[in-house]
Amino acid sequence: MKPLAYYEDQLLKDEKSFLKVTEIERLLSYAAYLLPAEFRDDQLKSQTITSILLLLHQFHTGLLFRKIAELPKTEQAILKSERTQYLEYFRKKNPSFEKVSELLYFLNISTFPIELVISKYNPSRQYDSVLFLESVKFLLRVHIMWTTGGDLPLSNPVLQRDFNVKTFIHLHKKYSNSGSAVVLKNSKKVVPRLNTVNSSLDFLQNRTPRLSSILPDEIFTKRLPNLRIFSNFIKVCRPLIYMLFMWHWKRKQKSSSLKVRPWGPWIVAFVFEVISQLIDRRCESATSSRQGFGLERRTNQSQFQHFVVWAFTQGRFYDEFTKHWINRSLSWVNSIPVFGKYLLLSVEERQKSLENYISSVRNY
């Protein structure tokens, strides 16, 4: 596509690529607030716009990493975090890892808009579609676990801009300047000219700490203990098991007048999470010696925090459960003289913003 190629060339032609990308995304985010109210109030339109902006953000991130790949490997190590090196290692090891990760990311940000579309035009198929999407995401996560030797899939399994902006601009400017760099004829490598290189002592002092950020491949090849793999598998199963129970409850509800809220799926999901956390604590001493364990520990913590948010807001049933009890608990506020009405309006506004947040959390 010529327009897309032209767009990429304009973004990547100089060292200000990152600033251009950030400015474009910021302008588009501001433009979303200028849309008519129907786009912001309508949940389907709002979620669709959010998903499109996230996809554009990830497209720009891919372009920036393409620019980083043009630098020498020693300079790339300055910009690439442990998380980035982890993803790139498995991308090289298994060609399907990148496609599976991108597909999982796309499904994560598009599941809720897809569900809204189906619930609007074919409500009877809403739970069937969500169960199908959760099944596909489950298979993708299991594939990632198999590729990485049992690691828990990252909540965002694609590259992120976790590098220093000033360093990125400085290095890009340094190696794009023909006066400070030269391309070797045989290897086509870009190296700095001799007159731009510091003395050997300065070079060692400046480069040694940077080279220490390069992680050897061996830290990613070591397999996790079986118990930790089982714990990660429980976490991967939890969303699918929860949705399977809810799908069964919905079918049962259609065939009878049952209107009682099902606590069973929530309790099962909570038990799954508690079991996995107990296993993690037991295996922590065994895995703490594994290099790169910090990334796995941060992943487990973020997954658990996400689960806590979902658990306390009752997941996808916020509207019919949490909202009901909030309204009942605040029914007395309106009876307060003078300030009661204004306080109730303030609480309702806060509740509306909470609803919008919970709808973005979805069912994971």
Curated annotation (Swiss-Prot):
Q: Where is the protein found, in the record's own terms? A: Peroxisome membrane
Q: Which UniProt keywords apply?
A: Membrane, Peroxisome, Peroxisome biogenesis, Phosphoprotein
Q: Which GO terms describe its biological process?
A: peroxisome organization; protein import into peroxisome matrix; protein import into peroxisome membrane
Q: Does the keyword Phosphoprotein apply?
A: yes
What membrane topology does this protein have? Answer: Peripheral membrane protein
Q: Which InterPro entries match?
A: Pex16
Q: What is its main location?
A: membrane
Q: Mark the residues carrying the PTM Phosphoserine.
A: S200
Q: Look up keyword Plastid and say if it applies.
A: no
Q: Name one Pfam family in it.
A: Pex16
* Any Gene Ontology CC annotation: peroxisomal membrane
Spell out the PANTHER family in the cross-references: PEROXISOMAL MEMBRANE PROTEIN PEX16
Family, according to the entry, reads as follows: Belongs to the peroxin-16 family.
What does this chain do?
Answer: Involved in the biogenesis of peroxisomes.
Supply the name of the protein: Peroxisomal membrane protein PEX16
